[in-house]
A protein has these predicted regions:
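N-proximal low-complexity "stem/linker" segments adjacent to membrane-targeting elements
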Residues: 1-24
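Cell-envelope/extracellular polymer assembly enzymes that use nucleotide-activated donors
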Residues: 4-6, 33, 190
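Short, acidic, metal-binding catalytic loop of nucleotide-sugar glycosyltransferases
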Residues: 23-32
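Glycine-rich, basic loop-to-helix element that forms the pyrophosphate-binding segment
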Residues: 60-76
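Conserved donor NDP-sugar-binding/catalytic core segment of glycosyltransferases
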Residues: 93-133
Length: 263
């Protein structure tokens, strides 16, 4: 029998937060499949998979953010899948809330929720970046807005307020792989832009149901340090705007990159 939902945990090297992430998935109020996917197999990841009796699948191909996420996504045999990032945690009612929204929709594409940040093990529910993202998402809370391609594309035309690890995908209504190879920083924004053009629902919960960890060792912080994000953001803006407006928005949006630093 096909499973309803799978958490696919993408593990990389030896994250000290991996076990905390997995425990948050095990403590969900409704049960789910959980698998661990990695392109960097090691004894540390194997020991955690063995400790919690979880399947461990190894990507034998090219390693990278989009490659690893697509590998995890395509190696799940369930109606819905959440790609869980190893550094993040999920509140106990995340999956229950997601499934209620997804199962109640006529043609779901993705579910996503609000989130909080974890900085030095402290939960931060409000800062400038979080407030901006919540403001950007206000239109999708309007009646019938979740079905509107026009509304979600207008939201995405100003940036990506959707937190990637908060997303659950309805696989039957989506392409085989959702992340485009070649993107390293805006791979999630690219995916939402692609999905936003499809017929179906963007389902949103304004409850902060998961925690996204901010730390200097994260891949996002590394990308910001080498300025790899700005070029990709310009590419994304050009999907919605002419060149001059795209460059103007890109300059304004790039100031938010500092929110991924601990200082």
């Amino acid at each position: 029998m096909k499973q309803l939902h799978t958490f696919a945990v993408c593990a990389y090297k030896e994250s000290p937060y991996l076990e905390e992430c997995i425990r948050s998935l095990l403590f969900q109020t409704v049960s789910s499949n959980i698998i661990i996917a990695t392109s960097t197999p090691n004894d540390y990841i194997s020991s955690i998979a063995e400790k919690y009796d979880l399947p461990l699948i190894v990507n034998p191909g090219e390693s990278g953010i989009t490659q690893d996420w697509n590998f995890a996504y395509t190696h799940t045999d369930s109606k819905y899948v959440t790609i869980a990032h190893q550094d993040d945690i999920y509140d106990a009612e995340y999956l229950e809330t997601a499934l209620k929204k997804l199962e109640g929709a006529r043609r779901p594409l993705i579910f996503f929720s609000d989130y909080y940040e974890i900085r030095e093990n402290e939960k931060t529910y409000s800062n400038r970046l979080l407030r901006i993202k919540r403001l950007m998402l206000l239109p999708i809370r309007l009646p019938m807005a979740e079905q509107s391609r026009w509304i979600r594309r207008r939201i995405l035309s100003f940036g990506s307020p959707i937190c990637c690890p908060s997303v659950t995908f309805a696989k039957a209504n989506l392409p085989y792989a959702v992340f485009q190879h070649g993107f390293r920083a805006c791979e999630d924004w690219q995916a939402w832009e692609m999905i936003s053009k499809l017929k179906g629902d963007f389902l949103y919960s304004p409850r902060a149901l998961m925690g996204h960890r901010i730390h200097e060792g994260s891949e996002t912080s590394a990308i910001i340090e080498d300025h790899g994000r700005t070029e990709e953001e310009y590419i994304m803006y050009r999907k919605f705007w002419p060149d001059k407006i795209a460059r103007m928005l890109n300059r304004a949006y790039s100031t938010a990159q500092g929110s991924n630093h601990l200082e």
